[in-house]
Amino acid sequence: METLLNLNNPTYKLSTVEYNFFHENGYIVIKALFSETECDRIYELFCEHAEEDFPAIINLDRKVPELHNVMKMPKVVSIIEELIDSEASGLMTQMLFKEANTAYANQAWEVHQDNAYHQNPNGETLTINIACKDAFVENGTLYVYPGSHKEGILKFEARKSFREDKGSQPGNKLLLPEKYLDHKTDLIMKKGDMLILHGNCAHGSYGNSTEFSRPLYSITYIKKGGEFLVGRNANRKEFALH
């Protein structure tokens, strides 16, 4: 029997406006790319493996094939490969729950760049974030600094960012050039929306002070054969997508 999270979905063709917006700003939100039932299934699978306080879970897809399918879905891969103009590979996955009324709910991530972790010298990594429930400021959505991806990897202070202390603010802390400070943009997402972030786009997130959880399923991609740091916790490695 075919699983709910499968590869039987059409490719997605970006419009010229969408393509240009991403390359100018370093991010884009694709509306309603995932169905409510797909989002519910992703969240359900992660909840089955969650610990009491719902800390982040890394690379569960390597044990749960149905989650690994999400990395390889044509409607996702087609977008990634169009944006990097090349064949891509998957690198890692992560669920950030921000589960309401838990010790990790109110964590607000410092402004950081994902590529500070990946360490790809050419800026050829992208991370998708699938909103498994609605995400808004009060329940911990992300904010971005448009155009900051053009700066390359900025200097940063390395900080613990996985299984960190409860109530702490994780994320490598960077010094953002002043010209971006007035352009902070909150990303309000509906269930099923997918955010795509350039690896060098500076971003952070708010804490969750509500009764509404904010689970985001994140998957990182890289230009096939690109250089990256494996990482002690992330254990990144290339996965074929075709």
Spell out what each predicted region is:
Residues 93-95, 128-130, 217-221:
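A structural signal for short, well-ordered beta-strand segments
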Residues 107-113, 168-183, 213, 232-237:
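Short, surface-exposed loop/helix-turn segments at secondary-structure junctions
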Residues 1-120, 232, 236-242:
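Non-heme Fe(II)-dependent double-stranded beta-helix
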Residues 86, 115, 130-141, 149:
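Active-site region of the double-stranded beta-helix
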